């Protein structure tokens, strides 16, 4: 059934890829609530779209323009969200850099901090047992 419909549709356009785009747009319209132009018996929207194109009940150029507009909207949304992600990422990087810098400054200034004692001593690579004995020696 669909093979005959595709062969009939090739009379409207000589490009199979364009036919797929046209049928996809019409099926999208039908799924969104558009009324079918031809009568059908419980067919799927993709088959109905192909039958409408084959029956020359649709303006192929306007259908193609709708598909291009839908693609443009999607791409604009995608590009805008990508730019927003890059902007947010740069803001996050700045905040993370400030947090890291302030954390290192706090470690160096706080002598009661265990991390500051560890970083300030020569026994950085020693075992925990050796660190405990060297802390009591000081």
Curated annotation (Swiss-Prot):
GO biological process: DNA-templated transcription
Class of the enzyme per the UniProt entry, highest EC level: transferase
Stored SUPFAM superfamilies: RPB6/omega subunit-like
EC number: 2.7.7.6
Region (Disordered): 117-138
GO molecular function, one term: DNA-directed RNA polymerase activity
Keyword terms, alphabetized: DNA-directed RNA polymerase, Nucleotidyltransferase, Transcription, Transferase
Polar residues bias: start-end ranges: 124-138
Pfam families: RNA_pol_Rpb6
Catalytic activity: RNA(n) + a ribonucleoside 5'-triphosphate = RNA(n+1) + diphosphate
Lineage: superkingdom: Bacteria
Single GO cellular component term: DNA-directed RNA polymerase complex
Subunit-level organization: The RNAP catalytic core consists of 2 alpha, 1 beta, 1 beta' and 1 omega subunit. When a sigma factor is associated with the core the holoenzyme is formed, which can initiate transcription.
Function: Promotes RNA polymerase assembly. Latches the N- and C-terminal regions of the beta' subunit thereby facilitating its interaction with the beta and alpha subunits.
Family membership: Belongs to the RNA polymerase subunit omega family.
Protein name (record): DNA-directed RNA polymerase subunit omega
